């Protein structure tokens, strides 16, 4: 219960321990109230909280591959359209281009900050901005699906700076972004000395060190 959480948080702080929460806002569960409402009707006020597209010639809207293999699109018979999921089909991607999505995400973050948490570890935060129009990716020889190219999207820094203004800058927080596919130079934009986005990032290059 939330009472259990409050008691745990107070106990941690009494012992000089800080609590950093996992923040997953590139996508939600397909059981989240937003998605349940979004899929219910094309006219739902939550429809544009996610990416819904019609199929092309009886196939997916584009050739993007999911990080978990297969198409990044799943057909939903309720409205005869597909929704985007860069990961599992149980994890539909949020549409960060929609200001209402950003407002609700920031409101949720502020709520947790007011509870007294000490930071956020942000899951795949470098992927929240998709290419305008969701164009087909470049197919590699022999491939069926293409890399969606959603890392370091056109508005990712704009959205993180907005997050900083609306939430992060108002609290004493440690923030770390999971940024797969982000170069060292690009990482400086996410966690620069100007403090306009995140405290730090972690990358995955170290995994390949033994490969030479």
Where are these regions (language model features)?
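Acidic/aromatic-lined carbohydrate-recognition and catalytic surfaces
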Residues: 1-110, 114, 127-182
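Noncatalytic carbohydrate-binding groove/subsite architecture in carbohydrate-active enzymes
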Residues: 179-212
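Short, small-residue-rich loop/turn micro-motifs
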Residues: 124-129, 204-206
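Hydrophobic residues within beta-strands of alpha/beta enzymes
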Residues: 120-122
């Amino acid at each position: 219960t939330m009472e259990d959480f409050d008691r745990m948080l107070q106990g941690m702080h009494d012992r000089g321990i800080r609590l950093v929460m996992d923040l997953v806002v590139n996508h939600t569960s397909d059981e989240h109230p937003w998605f349940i409402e979004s899929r219910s009707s094309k006219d739902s006020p939550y429809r544009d909280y996610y990416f819904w597209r019609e199929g092309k010639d009886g196939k997916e809207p584009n050739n993007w591959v999911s990080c978990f293999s297969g198409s990044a699109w799943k057909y939903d018979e309720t409205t005869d359209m597909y929704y985007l999921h860069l990961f599992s089909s149980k994890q539909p991607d949020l549409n960060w281009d929609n200001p209402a999505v950003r407002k609700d995400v920031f409101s949720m973050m502020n709520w947790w900050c007011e509870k007294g948490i000490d930071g956020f570890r942000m899951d795949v935060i470098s992927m929240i901005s998709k290419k305008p129009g969701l164009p087909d990716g470049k197919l590699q020889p022999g491939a069926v699906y293409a890399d969606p190219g959603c890392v370091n999207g056109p508005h990712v820094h704009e959205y993180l700076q907005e997050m900083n203004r609306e939430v992060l800058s108002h609290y004493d927080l440690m923030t770390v972004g999971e940024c797969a596919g982000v170069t060292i130079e690009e990482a400086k934009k996410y966690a620069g000395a100007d403090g306009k986005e995140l405290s730090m990032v972690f990358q995955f290059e170290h995994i390949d060190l033994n490969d030479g």
